[in-house]
Amino acid sequence: MLNNIRSKQIFIVSAIAVLVAFLFTRDIKGLVKPKEETSNMPAGGQMAPSAAPEPINLEEVSTTAKNLMNTNLAAEITSLENKYKGDAEDKKAATAKILAQKWDDLEHAIPSALYLEIVANKEQTLNNWLITGDRFLKAFDNNRDSLIQPALLQKANSAFTNAMKLDSTNNDAKTGLGITIVNGMGMPMQGIAMLMDVVKKDPKNLKANMSLGTFAIKSGQFDKAIIRFQDIIAIKPSPDAYFYLGTAYENLGKNTEAIEAYLSSKKLAANATLSKFIDDKVTELKLKK
């Protein structure tokens, strides 16, 4: 029971973190003030093509993360890391799994993903590559550092590519790969086509539908976004789905519908940061009615 409650709390906190990060890094009407808008964001919201990203150093990432936690937890991590370094090669995967879980429990997705990648390289199963790809995507979504984001996205892309090699029909692998392509690892429409194919075969696939919905918002296709998020809410209501629905309505000047969607997001999220944002947003929209 306690584990279920904790998992739900972590999911909600993570969802809000991703949502807030999305809101404040996209040039979408109503979400940023004119003076805060940037002019160098590529069309569609994807990352601009660049040179090969700098590799991620696991030791540096670990040290940075440990500096943010209490001494006892840091010591526990260090002890596991020392065990991993001293393990025989055939024992390293088991310790890497423990470290990946420990880092995930502490909400540090980057070192967790790096250890999962080690496991996947040693035990190349479909599930291992899917978990690795998902963790790198989580790290990508939660990270605002433009220097490390490309490397995280590339690693996610590589993990899902490896998963596709093992099972090219797997919807989770195809969805993950499509998301990385849409976000900058290729031509966005190629990624959209992959996600559309997933939804065609599995209309209730939340991950693929959410990705298509957010891309519709990023690219200014608000009518399509409304339909997509209405479908998502019919499958499984969530704070972020309602918020994105409100965003789409607002951008089309449908303020009454936007307010209703925003308030539904606030009710489901029960998050102070998002509640304050929504309260301010609702006040602003009521003045426009």
Q: Where do the PLM segments sit?
A:
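N-terminal leader/linker segments that initiate helical-solenoid repeat arrays
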Residues: L2-I110
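Short coil turns that delineate tetratricopeptide repeat
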Residues: D90, E123-Q124, S168, P203, ...
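TPR alpha-solenoid repeat register
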Residues: T95, N128-W129, A173, A208, ...
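Canonical tetratricopeptide repeat
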Residues: I98, I131, R135, G176-L177, ...
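Residue-level recognition of tetratricopeptide repeat
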Residues: Q101, N121, D134, I179, ...
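Structural motif corresponding to the intra-repeat A-B loop/turn of tetratricopeptide repeats
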Residues: L106, A139, G184-M185, S219, ...
